[in-house]
Amino acid sequence: MKIAVEGCAHGELERIYDTIEGIEKVGGTKIDLLLCCGDFQSTRNLEDLQTMAVPKKYLDMCSFYKYYSGELVAPVLTIFIGGNHEASNYLQELPYGGWVAPNIYYLGYAGVVNVNGVRIAGISGIFKGHDFLRGHHEFPPYTDSTCRSVYHVRQLEVFRLKQISGRVDIFLSHDWPTGIYEYGNKAQLLRKKPFFAADMESGKLGSQPLEELLKAVQPAYWFAAHLHCKFAALVPHNHSQKLGDAESSSSSSSSEDEDEEREKVKKAAPVPPPSKSVPVTKFLALDKCLPRRAFLQVVEVPSDPIEGTPRLEYDAEWLAILHSTNHLISVKENYYYLPGKKAGEFTERSNFTPTEEELEAVTAKFQKLQVPENFERTVPAFDPAEQSDYKHMFVDQPKVQLNPQSNTFCATLGIDDPLCLVLLANGLDLPAVGATECKDRETKSSKLQAVEEDVAEPLVTPTKRKLNLSLPAPTTAAADTTDENVIDLPEEEAEEAIIATETPHVEEPASVPASPNVKKLKRRNQNIYQAQED
């Protein structure tokens, strides 16, 4: 399989696909798959654009909206991860991945998929130590703080990826793993980027959690971006590290009891697919999409035969990991800790590499692992004809939305959507799945909602709403409910009673006796009115 790898896309999809077309023409070959290492910028409209963490002067719609609207179609299956310049609201709708446009697939906060037998894993975002131990507490509309923290890597995704067993052919990240420059031409890198020297000396260049993942997962290829330069490295692995040294260097390393549990799971787990050993990881970072920049690389990876278009499938082991770690999701802003090495007696499971039984349970839920092509447009796309002057327009951030793809995926697997959890944790109503508008944040009576949907004419006043809820159709003419003829009831009575007005000369039909409460209200009202007239 021939795979094109892109560094930072920065929304330039048309240019990237044109470059691939040029490579195909010159080389007389066919590119089967495009992988993008973040800063994808899947902005559908101006509202999405407001959630990108960049200075206002750099906000640009670019060309993704054309693929979202259907004006253009991605000519090659495209898989991407998130970076630090994204339409964060849209990506947050798809925490476990999904289609952002036809033939363009997002891996989620972290994910593992298979394309014709090529196993691809990835993690979105960049590392910031002050947010790493927090939950996914952000939701739109974002504050100045949360519009940045929303794309910061969290410990849960790293923890989940460490549970993977067997081979991983390709790993995608936006950040670089810490220390990766020691395995390549460091001197040449410093000539290109001399200001990297200070961060190298302080150990701040790159992501420590990604370094741990590199040692734990040991993929054949690792592709990254973010630092806007091309850099290659070869990282040798001692295979005893995979369940040893890599774990001891991790913040969630195992105790002796956990090691025993891991040995049991290893014996119970199915044998991973046969593959050649991976003595080294081939690391490659690429630049952003600009002229005369090294932003695209084509690699050839062994795969199953491709008949027609490549086949995108869920990874059964990853599904089982998501299911078994669902209880570890946090949507709180405070720090929390995952199962691992700790003082005292070991009481909690910390190894979630799936057993045979867990894999069987997942495959029973997903009888076909092929990812369904269930993309839906849930918001209007950008219209350049009507919004050409958008850089001078004032646009609010979008309201929070739920995506039908995530709803289907979570329901099938039996897990929670983190976006739903954070809304509920903050006392907000869940918006309709796929709707363009968020529901009222005020709690409404379900009966009232049903009446509002059934009534042909709009209900204008609160009185009319209560009338429809509390009484059958009136048998007499509607009463005059002007301000001077209405009295205020106590709040508790107002929820159940009807605001009554004086009708002194009309007798109730014998067949429909008036309720005692209504008579009492009429007498009390009449006394009040008479007192006022006197």
Curated annotation (Swiss-Prot):
InterPro entries the record matches: Calcineurin-like_PHP_ApaH (IPR004843), DBR1_C (IPR007708), Dbr1_N (IPR041816), Metallo-depent_PP-like (IPR029052)
Pfam families the UniProt entry points to: DBR1, Metallophos
Binding site for a divalent metal cation 1: C8, H10, H228
Residues annotated to bind a divalent metal cation 2: D39, N84, H174, H226
Compartment(s): Nucleus
Regulation: Active in presence of diverse metals including Fe(2+), Zn(2+), Mn(2+). Binds two metal cations in two adjacent alpha and beta metal-binding pockets.
S-S bridge residues: none
GO molecular function: metal ion binding; RNA lariat debranching enzyme activity
Cofactor annotation remark: Binds 2 divalent metal cations per subunit.
CDD domains: MPP_Dbr1_N
Cofactors named for this entry: Fe(2+); Zn(2+); Mn(2+)
Keywords of the record: Hydrolase, Iron, Manganese, Metal-binding, mRNA processing, Nucleus, Zinc
Record-linked SUPFAM superfamilies: Metallo-dependent phosphatases
Database matches in Gene3D superfamilies: 3.60.21.10
Catalytic activity, EC: 3.1.4.-
Domain of life: Eukaryota
Start and end residues of each stretch annotated as Disordered: 242-275, 501-534
GO cellular component: nucleus
One BP annotation, GO: mRNA splicing, via spliceosome
Family under the similarity heading: Belongs to the lariat debranching enzyme family.
Protein name stated in the entry: Lariat debranching enzyme
Species: Drosophila melanogaster (Fruit fly)
Lineage: Eukaryota, Metazoa, Ecdysozoa, Arthropoda, Hexapoda
Encoding gene, per UniProt annotation: ldbr
